[in-house]
Amino acid sequence: MQKRFYNKESINKLIVVKKPLFISSNSYLTKIKKKYKNKKAGFSGTLDPFAKGCLIVAFGQYSKLFKYLKKTPKTYKAVVWLGAISESFDIEKVISVDLVEKIDLDNIKYQLNSLVGELEYIPPKFSAKKIEGVRAYELARQGHDFELNKCKMNIYNTKFISYRHP
């Protein structure tokens, strides 16, 4: 009979953690595994390093539950920096910032609502999409030239929160 050095019930857990900015999902999982003193853990879904949000983390046999969890729809909150030009389309690699003219609030709301529905888009090169097992953002940081395939997404609802012009 095999001798256990841990409490069998405590090794199987399913938790939701809030991943902070500036860290990859894998790096954050490593911290979570150390905190809970558990080597066997995984997460569902990957957030870009420059995104913060919820990761579902499973320990032990509970990682088998991921296939039963509904992953959509998701909710996103974004801050849009008008006039900023960035190679990565986020706060990394900002090339320049230009002052833009004040935009009509009704026009902003109209454009935001026009996004509702099914959209086809090409993900940015600085994304967590994988190309032959490697994250696109890693290849982009190394200066590799590559193309990502188009993706489809559905936007079910938009909500305008605020607008502040400099």
Regions found by a protein language model. Give the residues of each.
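Catalytic/RNA-binding core of pseudouridine synthases
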Residues: M1-P166
